[in-house]
C-alpha cells in the first residue's frame, strides 16, 4: 500500500451510504465502488440502500454488504393515473431514508442511479450530508439532474456532460465494472470449452442485461434455423430470467442445435467475454464500459423502453467514433442476425472495432470514485 493509501487509512471509521440499484447495470458498479472504498479504507462502514423487491436486495448481501430496502417504485409513464400510489411510496421512502441517515450517520452518501437513489440522496442533501452522484449515461436522467443541485461531486463517463451539470462539480471517472472481469482473463480455448463449444469456431455472445431483452430474444428465436445452418459460427445466448422458459421451449421445438449454448444468466462473465469474438447487447452504460475495457467488438441494440432514450445516445457516442455497430430495436428482427454474421466473417472489421473501442476505456474508475468519496468525508 502506498503512502497516499496509508494516509487515507488513518482516522475515525469512514461511514458511507451507497444508494441505487434495480438492474445489474446499477448494482455491479455500486459494489465495485464499495470494494474500492474498503481497499483504501479497510475500517470503512458501508450501508447500501435499495428498493424493496428489486435485484439489489439479493445481490448486495451476496457481495458481503448490508442493505436496507425502501418502498419506492418507478413512475409509470404510460398510465399516469397509477402514479398516485407511486407518489405515496416516494413520501414513505423519503421518511424511511431520513431515519436511516439519522441512525447510520454517514459522512458521505453516494447515488448510483435506480429507484432508491432519489429519495436517499435528496434526504442526505437536506440533512447536510455531502453527496456524490455517478451518472453512467451520456444523457443525464431527470433524477440526477435534480440531485446535482446539491451534490458536491458528479462522476461521469462521457464528454460534454456540462450541458446537464455544473462544470465545476464534474469529474471524468468512467463507469466502474466488475473487478473479476479484469482480474480473471481465462484463455479463449478454455473459456469456449467451458460452454461446451468448439474453440476452432468464431463465437458470438448475446446479452440482454440481467433481466433480458424481448426484441433480441425474439429475433434469435425467429432465426434459430439460420443459426443451425451457420455451422462455422457458434452462439452463447444469455436470455435473462424473464424470457428463459420461452427461449428454451423454442430451442427444444427447433431440434438439436449443436452450435448454440443457452442460459438464463451467465455467472462467469470473464469466461463469456474471453470466448466472444463479437458481442450483441443492449446499450446500458455499465455493459459499454466493460466492452471498452475488454476491447470487445459489439453490435448495440438500444432498448427503446428507457428514460430519455438514453441507450440510443450511449450507442451513438460509440458509433460516432467507429467503435460499435448500431441496429435499431425496430429493425432488429430483419437486420440483427445478418449484420452479426457479416461482421464476424470480416476479420478487418472486427479488428477495427476492437481497436477503436479500446481507445474509449477508462480504467480504475471505482478507485477514482472511492478517492473522491474519501476526500468528501475528510472535508465534512
From Swiss-Prot:
Catalytic activity: di-trans,octa-cis-undecaprenyl diphospho-N-acetyl-alpha-D-muramoyl-L-alanyl-D-glutamyl-meso-2,6-diaminopimeloyl-D-alanyl-D-alanine + UDP-N-acetyl-alpha-D-glucosamine = di-trans,octa-cis-undecaprenyl diphospho-[N-acetyl-alpha-D-glucosaminyl-(1->4)]-N-acetyl-alpha-D-muramoyl-L-alanyl-D-glutamyl-meso-2,6-diaminopimeloyl-D-alanyl-D-alanine + UDP + H(+)
Compartment list: Cell inner membrane
E.C. designation(s): 2.4.1.227
Pathway, per record: Cell wall biogenesis; peptidoglycan biosynthesis
One GO term describing the cellular component: plasma membrane
Disulfide-bond pairs as recorded: none
Example GO molecular function: UDP-N-acetyl-D-glucosamine:N-acetylmuramoyl-L-alanyl-D-glutamyl-meso-2,6-diaminopimelyl-D-alanyl-D-alanine-diphosphoundecaprenol 4-beta-N-acetylglucosaminlytransferase activity
GO terms under biological process: carbohydrate metabolic process; cell division; cell wall organization; lipid glycosylation; peptidoglycan biosynthetic process; regulation of cell shape
Gene3D superfamilies, alphabetized: Glycogen Phosphorylase B
Membrane topology: Peripheral membrane protein
Residues reported to bind UDP-N-acetyl-alpha-D-glucosamine: 23-25, 137, 178, 210, 266, 311
Keywords linked to the UniProt accession: Cell cycle, Cell division, Cell inner membrane, Cell membrane, Cell shape, Cell wall biogenesis/degradation, Glycosyltransferase, Membrane, Peptidoglycan synthesis, Transferase
Pfam family of the protein (one): Glyco_transf_28
EC primary class: transferase
InterPro entries (UniProt xref): GlcNAc_MurG, Glyco_trans_28_C, GlycoTrans_28_N
Function: Cell wall formation. Catalyzes the transfer of a GlcNAc subunit on undecaprenyl-pyrophosphoryl-MurNAc-pentapeptide (lipid intermediate I) to form undecaprenyl-pyrophosphoryl-MurNAc-(pentapeptide)GlcNAc (lipid intermediate II).
Family: Belongs to the glycosyltransferase 28 family. MurG subfamily.
Name by which UniProt lists this protein: UDP-N-acetylglucosamine--N-acetylmuramyl-(pentapeptide) pyrophosphoryl-undecaprenol N-acetylglucosamine transferase
Taxonomic placement: Bacteria, Pseudomonadati, Bacteroidota, Bacteroidia, Bacteroidales
